[in-house]
Design a protein with these regions (language model features):
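A glycine-rich beta-to-alpha transition motif near the start of alpha/beta enzyme domains, typified by
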Residues: 1-114, 144, 150-165
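Surface-exposed beta-loop interaction hotspot
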Residues: 118-161
Length: 165
């Protein structure tokens, strides 16, 4: 039996995200996400589930691991703008791993491209981490957000990034 799932695949800053548009029981999120993430299915790095609350937020995003994700939240807001037919908009986004409503601002760039920004919760913790490889020391910022940890490395130019590493 084939199950039909409506979804949008977004690519916010290279962080490919599947946003499931249908109501899916929470206990089925993990198994559905595992299927959708497979390259032979849709393929992406992560899955979020959208719901439409009737309260303070315009959209609710529940990530497959219960974490907060700024890129997926921006994508949810961009999806709302795409449905509105407008060229710009402000949206209130609720996301797992975050206990406040976040304001997102989205502008249609061209076609199906969007420029979206969103408030992010304050980190629980931030540290500086240094790693040395081939006598070169790299400095990273370790940023702990609710449900997820990021390592951020600033580079003088995107051209200096080894995309095959």
């Amino acid at each position: 039996m084939t199950e039909e799932i409506h979804y949008v695949k977004a690519d916010p800053s290279g962080n490919t995200t599947i946003l499931v548009l249908d109501a899916v029981p929470k206990q089925e999120h993990a198994s559905l996400a595992a299927r959708l993430l497979q390259p032979e299915c849709v393929g992406a790095e992560q899955v979020g589930f959208l719901t439409w609350p009737d309260k303070e937020a315009d959209v609710r995003l529940d990530m497959m691991g219960g974490e907060f994700c700024g890129n997926a939240s921006r994508s949810a807001a961009a999806y709302l703008l795409s449905r509105s037919g407008q060229d710009h908009g402000e949206y209130r986004v609720s996301c797992s791993g975050c206990n406040k409503i976040l304001k997102a601002v989205v502008v249609r760039d061209e076609g199906e491209l969007y420029d979206a920004s969103i408030e992010v919760p304050l980190p629980r913790k931030m540290d500086i981490v240094s790693l040395t490889d081939n006598d070169i020391t790299y400095r990273f910022y370790q940023i702990e957000l609710p449900g997820i940890m990021h390592f951020v490395h600033f580079t003088p130019s995107i051209k200096t990034i080894d995309k095959n590493a």
